Amino acid sequence: MPMNRREFLAASAASTAMLNQGMTAFAAVTGNIQVTIDASKSGDPVNPMVFGGYMEPATTSVWAEMLTDRKFANPITDAAPAPAPTNSFFRRFFGEPFKPVGPAGTVAMDTVRPFVAKHSPLVKLGGTEPRGIQQSKLRVGRGKTYEGCIYLAGDTGAKVVVRLVWGRGAGESQTVTIPSLSPEYKKFPLKFTAAVGTEDARLEILGTGSGTFHVGTASLMPADNVQGFHAGMIRLFKEAGFKMFKWPGGNFVSAYDWRDGLGDRDKRPPRLQPMWSDRAEPNDVGLHDFIALCRLVGAEPDLAIDSGFGSAREAAEQVEYCNGSVETRMGKMRAENGSPEPFNVRCWCIGNEMYGPWQYGHMSLDQYCVKHNYIVEAMKKVDPKIKVTVSGASICEKSVGGAEKKGNFFPSIWEPPIAERLPYEFGSVNDWDGRLLDKCVDNIDYLSEHTYAYPDLAFDAEKQLFVDVHDPLQFRARRLANRIGEAFEAWDKYVEKMPWLKEKDIKFIFDEWGNRLRSASGNGGGGFMRQTGMLMPLSYALCFHEMLRHSDMIAASCATGGLRTVLTDNTGEAVGFATEGLVMKLMQTNFLNAYPIAVEGDSPQQLLPGTALVDRGTKPTGSPTYPLDILAAFTSDRKKFLISVVNPTEVGHSFTPKISGVKLRDQGKLYQIAPPDLSSTNEVGKEPAVKINETAQNGLPETVLVPAVSVSLYEFDVA
């Protein structure tokens, strides 16, 4: 008989010693760990959407477009541009702008006859001297073909060529000659094949002759793109087993108008996105494109709507656009844009972090409760079958945000200093989940929780600041899982205060989670881009274990770095899995719809340094098998038995399993990630140092040896 959540967690933690909240000393491991697994005590099936990824901004690095600001949201000027970011991820969004070619004053921004932006480049010709615009720092691969288009208008005396240049020699480029121009914008195809690979190619749009010509927009992509997306990323995301994508944010959504992403891609208006430092958003990835991505990968869409500047009417129209028949006004518009069949989007997130003053359209908690109800009631009037996620925050999420503010982690003159002591109190004006659950409970299906951890920091309750800690690997890796655990502690507190919540089937969606790597002073940062060896993969594995244990309380999750867990070459194409990507693949391809089983042990987990309900809970997370973390489960058909073991230490350990309630066949498999050392990582152009190794097993050993810095998944058929 399935166990309820409290019985399941109580069984899993039966051997865990209760530790004082302020305890910072760690018990030493002695002897072999004794583990008991009772297969008759299984939990609810794991929702496949736990294995999700998160996309922000609207047009992400998954998109194959090579040109920055291709619709000219920003003017082209003679002034020297700001240096382009060196990081390949950010180059895609804040990269090299178009520059004028020719003497000063050659290029003007015409606001009278713009193509799609508020202005378009107007090039003044000067006879035989080539004049126009160019964009540098393009990344091309040897022998790789690139295709695109350009919209041009101009005088008949203008002779225009478009050239892809990959070197300095006369033969180190390829040219497309444009037929004669007309006063009206026309679309011309482009196609190039690069003879060499370089990260400093450039696209030139040049004219000679007399008169002027306008550039409306230009586009260039690898020819092997799949509906506009990088082919390698589609292949690897599908292989990894992503089952949900959240889009278009994140902070991005609170100033995003979904209608900007409809219609002909080249004619969608570009915008300067205020939530991303006025980055030029071309709106190339719109609603239809996002749905196409989900279908290519086999993932469910999770659409975030703008509850900041956006209205209830706009949200309802978006639901009708996605799910309405062609007989409805918005459904007819969807059909006119190429999709007569409804998208049938079921998951909708109402805004993002609306508790934060950094959010466009931020308002007080009492006002937001009213707005949330207005929006959801309007949406469900259109389609009662949709599920909505409230943009709230437990006091844990709010308290971590307060701790970041106290440490000035994200400087802003618009956010007031934090005067209150942390953690915030339940029922206070900072308790967004508490108030929303009280005032909006009939309009909530899921609770959003954004869960970020700092592996090298702990919040000091006395100093009221994050401080540097020098913990062993197992505690650094476990901080993220502890943040997951404290969210469930907060839920239990809400149920205690509002008993009627027991009758509601409200679940969590951890729609942003990950690690942030920095010191208390801010040195050594680099966020998700920093190379960390096996720290991230171990942390991801422990986080998944904790979420799967709470299968009855989680509807979905989205790793913030989930869509960047692939390796990209110097052209931006995905060519393999990063180390954390392998962990996600291992978990996502084995635990879909699995039934977690209670695990007991004789080695309780240890309480981490920090402050309860800020950066950790009041009790440790994980199975009572310290320092190992063990998760057992049946596969969805109950024909296979799984034991997943994470060893987040730099030494080997062993455990003796005692399994009851099921009989296993001897023949089995072991899928194992066990690299040579902690610093092991995968790099482009090199043989992977971290792999998933598969070996046959002849029965589960009486004593299981677990290598250092490893994730091991045993699979046996049920007899």
PLM segments and residue spans:
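Aromatic/acidic polysaccharide-binding cleft in carbohydrate-active enzymes
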Residues: 506-628
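Conserved, mostly hydrophobic/aromatic
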Residues: 53, 150, 241, 294, ...
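Extracellular and organelle-lumenal recognition/adhesion modules and their flexible linkers in secreted
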Residues: 4-6, 28-283, 300-302, 310, ...
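Carbohydrate-binding surface patches
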Residues: 623-666, 670-673, 712-713
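Noncatalytic carbohydrate-binding groove/subsite architecture in carbohydrate-active enzymes
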Residues: 203, 365-537, 605-619
